[in-house]
Amino acid sequence: MELQLAIDLLNKEEAAKLAQKVEEYVDIVEIGTPIVINEGLPAVQHLNENINNAKVLADLKIMDAADYEVSQAVKYGADIVTILGVAEDASIKAAVEEAHKHGKALLVDMIAVQNLEQRAKELDEMGADYIAVHTGYDLQAEGKSPLDSLRTVKSVIKNSKVAVAGGIKPDTIKDIVAEDPDLVIVGGGIANADDPVEAAKQCRAAIEGK
């Protein structure tokens, strides 16, 4: 099981500094969509140049022009790139092919997918490296949790890894870990904590069953 830190609401310099502080506890650091919108792919490059061992994920939420956008993210140092599960099959296949051509990975974000079970099966067959169930900010505000979606996707896929994101914090991560996902994505639960290092440490301990 891997741990990913998602950073959304900082600038690229602040994001790199936070990543440096917690890197020993996380496997992947994500430059979130808001940072990409504000600062572009150079934010991915800046992070890549300032951390040592963690992989870098560029949360582009690709919807079209998939092979080009994956290639650009990879050029700027991304190890993993995201595409939306509601994108066309042709886009998903092109993104998978482009990522794998460079030895990189593709994460498919299931946000707003209506038929989770069917789409997860299709994405699994298309070669997605990760399928991520994602309760976005707007649904978190309504009290929604990704647990049921996680169970649904885990029950039907054969090859892809399952990732889970959405409001996960150090005090709730054990419920997620109990479902045995391959990747747990924590954003504000670490980034907005009074002590981000301690929060990351607690999340890592939960993942390792300590």
Curated annotation (Swiss-Prot):
SMART domains: OMPdecase (SM00934)
Superkingdom of the source species: Bacteria
Keyword Lyase: yes
Record GO terms (molecular function): 3-dehydro-L-gulonate-6-phosphate decarboxylase activity; hexulose-6-phosphate synthase activity; orotidine-5'-phosphate decarboxylase activity
Matching SUPFAM superfamilies: Ribulose-phoshate binding barrel
GO BP terms, alphabetized: 'de novo' pyrimidine nucleobase biosynthetic process; formaldehyde assimilation via ribulose monophosphate cycle; L-ascorbic acid catabolic process; one-carbon metabolic process
Substrates-to-products reaction catalysed: D-ribulose 5-phosphate + formaldehyde = D-arabino-hex-3-ulose 6-phosphate
Top-level enzyme category: lyase
Keywords, alphabetical: Carbohydrate metabolism, Lyase, One-carbon metabolism
Pathway(s) served: One-carbon metabolism; formaldehyde assimilation via RuMP pathway; D-fructose 6-phosphate from D-ribulose 5-phosphate and formaldehyde: step 1/2
CDD domains reported for this sequence: KGPDC_HPS
EC nos: 4.1.2.43
Pfam family, one: OMPdecase
Family named by the database record: Belongs to the HPS/KGPDC family. HPS subfamily.
Biological function: Catalyzes the condensation of ribulose 5-phosphate with formaldehyde to form 3-hexulose 6-phosphate.
UniProt name for this protein: 3-hexulose-6-phosphate synthase
